Swiss-Prot record:
The UniProt record lists the keyword Nucleotide-binding: yes
Keyword list, A-Z: ATP-binding, Cell inner membrane, Cell membrane, Membrane, Nucleotide-binding, Repeat, Sugar transport, Translocase, Transport
Reactions it catalyzes: D-ribose(out) + ATP + H2O = D-ribose(in) + ADP + phosphate + H(+)
The enzyme's E.C. designation: 7.5.2.7
Species for this entry: Escherichia coli O157:H7
UniProt GO molecular function: ABC-type D-ribose transporter activity; ATP binding; ATP hydrolysis activity
Assembly: The complex is composed of an ATP-binding protein (RbsA), two transmembrane proteins (RbsC) and a solute-binding protein (RbsB).
Name recorded for this polypeptide: Ribose import ATP-binding protein RbsA 2
Enzyme class: translocase
InterPro entries: AAA+_ATPase, ABC_carbohydrate_import_ATPase, ABC_transporter-like_ATP-bd, ABC_transporter-like_CS, P-loop_NTPase
Family, similarity comment: Belongs to the ABC transporter superfamily. Ribose importer (TC 3.A.1.2.1) family.
Source organism, top-level taxon: Bacteria
PROSITE patterns xrefs: ABC_TRANSPORTER_1 (PS00211), ABC_TRANSPORTER_2 (PS50893), RBSA (PS51254)
Length: 506
């Protein structure tokens, strides 16, 4: 690593009126380094990067490029310093070609005429350098999100950027697209580019970063090198408490009677005859590999999928569930794994999203009870600590963590007996995870039976009283007490060593 930093941000402060979003933050980045920037929502990560990119002007502090003071007051200043920030929302013109986007603001011209052919040739060279599969003449609107991201990177290379800032770049990418992006980022790092990578996804940070810096409440907490990366320490730095406090599943209440009892439930395809039981006040984990049938089993219970066999009991009574409406009437709530496509109404207000499942129940003679709806939404926002300026704010404008809590609040509002939670803390920062786990524990203390589907093994181990593991559409086994370990879960999930699988369930 080069001994001279390409970037130093010293004692950076940024005030909005009397509120300080940044309070004396330091950040040092070297050439040929992937430097991850972590912190909860509101920690100041994006604000710091906007100062670096010239979108905001620092209230105080100093920025050095190659060891020399450099004043950045505008985006043009940042570009002249070799800094490019790729925002979560792509800054591209969809109706223009890839080449036109790469050269936007710096078009080649001669005698007052734009040299489109030369722009296409130069743009294609940059695209080929990235290994991209599209052409410089393609319209941006025809590209995938991952390809549009490559256009942004190509534009940075065309501008000879030396510092590339990426803000949550994998948020809308598939696993394959994410893998390709990582390969590209590491190649740019090896070519000497400094990359600042903003993310709350620890797996990505572990895979990519050479160093990690953490912000909390607008202040610099510290940095860790790749050799010293530790999940527990990162969590402590981000939220101010150890990883063991994140789950806090000590609920100190006796488990009640069986609240949800599923007998040999099947759809004749993805889900083979499967049985499970969840008691009042219990959080039961449902683990397994992707494609094992976990989400499909929850959808059968909630009436989203049609069952071809089996039986469901709620509080000891056999029930027939043909639709989500029937499930809701029985006091069953279902948090879908895809909040944006299958859960939230992004263009509607937060309050409307919260009361979506209670409107029919609380209506008077077919008329909306607005006072009751407002009380429900206000109470839910307070209970779940949803950070919104007011209940009528558009759901699509909220952070991922607040969107997830908003969706959970919809099911809390029905006064549930049973909650089916599919990936309840996926895609949210550590602080939001902690609050979601707190809500789950509170609901369990009130006697709600919770079935939690999760692909995060620490979450399954940390939150579950018992764990069922699915494999190839069937329940492969059940784990209790000290047998709930990541190793035992993976043994059951993969089918490796079936003799051991039987041993850990006995």
């Amino acid at each position: 690593m080069n001994s001279t930093p390409v970037l130093e941000m010293r004692n950076i402060a940024k005030a909005f009126g009397k509120f300080y979003a940044l309070k004396g933050v330091d950040l040092t980045v070297y050439p040929g380094e992937i430097h991850a920037l972590m912190g909860e929502n509101g920690a100041g990560k994006s604000t710091l990067m906007k100062v670096l990119a010239g979108a905001y002007t620092a209230t105080s502090g100093e920025i050095l490029i190659d060891g020399k003071p450099f004043h950045i007051r505008t985006p043009k200043d940042a570009l002249s310093a070799g800094i490019t920030l790729i925002y979560q929302e792509m800054q591209l013109a969809p109706n223009l070609s890839v080449a036109e986007n790469i050269f936007l603001g710096s078009e080649l011209s001669h005698g007052g005429l734009v040299q489109r052919k030369e722009m296409l040739v130069q743009a294609q060279k940059v695209i080929d350098r990235l290994g991209a599969q599209f052409n410089a003449s393609d319209k941006v609107m025809t590209l995938t999100i991952a390809e549009q991201q490559q256009v942004e990177i190509a534009r940075a290379l065309h501008r000879n950027s030396r510092i590339l800032v990426m803000d949550e770049p994998t948020a809308a990418l598939s696993s394959r697209e994410t893998h390709r992006l990582f390969e590209l980022i590491m190649r740019l790092r090896d070519e000497g580019m400094a990359i600042i990578y903003i993310s709350h996804r620890m797996a990505e940070v572990y895979e990519l970063s050479d160093r990690v810096s953490v912000l909390r409440d607008g202040q610099y907490v510290g940095s860790l090198t790749r050799d010293n990366l530790n999940a527990g320490e990162l969590v402590r730095m981000m939220v101010g408490r150890p990883l063991s406090d994140l789950f806090n599943k000590e609920r100190d209440i006796p488990l009640g009677k069986a609240r949800l009892n599923v007998h040999h439930l099947t759809d004749g395809g993805k889900v083979q005859p499967s049985s499970l039981l969840v008691r009042s006040g219990e959080i039961v984990g449902l683990a397994g590999l992707v494609g094992a049938g976990r989400s499909e089993l929850a959808q059968l219970i909630f009436g989203v999928r049609k069952a071809t066999g089996g039986m469901i009991e709620v509080d000891g009574e056999p029930v027939v569930i043909h639709s989500p409406r029937e499930a809701i009437d029985l006091g069953i709530g279902f948090l879908t794994e895809n909040r944006k496509e299958q859960g939230l109404f992004l263009e509607m207000a937060a309050a409307e999203n919260i009361t979506m499942a209670t409107l029919e129940r609380d209506a008077r003679w077919g008329m909306l009870n607005r006072k009751k709806a407002q009380t429900i939404s206000d109470d839910a926002i307070k209970l779940l600590n949803i950070r919104v300026p007011h209940a009528q704010v558009r759901a699509g404008g909220l952070s991922g963590g607040n969107q997830q809590k908003l969706l959970i609040s919809r099911w809390v509002a029905i006064g549930p007996r049973i909650l089916l939670l599919d990936e309840p803390a996926r895609g949210v920062d550590v602080g939001a995870k902690s609050e979601i786990y707190r809500i789950m524990n509170e609901m369990a203390r009130k006697g709600v039976a919770i079935l939690m589907i999760s692909s995060e093994l620490p979450e399954i181990v940390g939150m579950s009283d018992r764990v069922y593991v699915m494999r190839e559409g069937s329940i492969a086994g059940e784990l209790n007490g000290k047998n709930i370990t990541q190793e035992n879960i993976m043994t059951l999930a993969t089918g490796v060593n079936d003799a051991h699988s039987q041993a850990v369930t006995s």
